[in-house]
Amino acid sequence: MKNKLIAKSLLTIAAIGITTTTIASTADASEGYGPREKKPVSINHNIVEYNDGTFKYQSRPKFNSTPKYIKFKHDYNILEFNDGTFEYGARPQFNKPAAKTDATIKKEQKLIQAQNLVREFEKTHTVSAHRKAQKAVNLVSFEYKVKKMVLQERIDNVLKQGLVR
């Protein structure tokens, strides 16, 4: 009876000891994964400058053959790799407005001319103005499809009224 009691008490003490050590070890491990105090600000000739004013020289040994992959992306476009080195990331892409070529300028001029001729046809209601306006609308590029349809509808509305001299 005494042996069973001693065995049970030893087992409970061992179980309590194991649980306390695991809780303590997980608490220590969780401290490393929180927000970092040091964040890299700039990199110049393999020297990393941190936000607290400290510097660190970084080098990747030649014999280190493990593949590099991005572990963390910091501010200022700085990447941290799995081997502890830092590098600037790819430059962000900015879409610059394309310079207008001569062809696009000519297409825009044809559209403006067609708009003016349709406006003139709406005022005068003459056959010659209709022919000029219709020809100009037909020459408008397919890139201005919606505007071309609007101009054609304006011509059709004037023709529906009748009264073309």
From Swiss-Prot:
InterPro entries noted in UniProt: Efb_C_sf, Extracellular_fibrinogen-bd_C, Sbi_C3_db_domIV
Subcellular location: Secreted
Signal peptide limits: 1-29
A GO term from the CC aspect: extracellular space
GO MF annotations in UniProt: complement binding
Stored Pfam families: efb-c
Coiled-coil segments: none
Principal location listed in the UniProt entry: secreted
Keyword Translocase part of the UniProt annotation: no
Keywords assigned: Secreted, Signal, Virulence
Function: Extracellular fibrinogen-binding protein that plays an important role in virulence. By interacting with the alpha chain of fibrinogen and its derivative fibrin, enhances a non-functional interaction between fibrinogen and platelets and is responsible for repression of fibrinogen-dependent platelet aggregation. In addition, assembles a fibrinogen protective shield around the bacteria which results in impaired phagocytic clearance by the host.
Self-association and partners: Interacts with host fibrinogen alpha chain/FGA. Interacts with host complement protein C3.
Protein name: Fibrinogen-binding protein
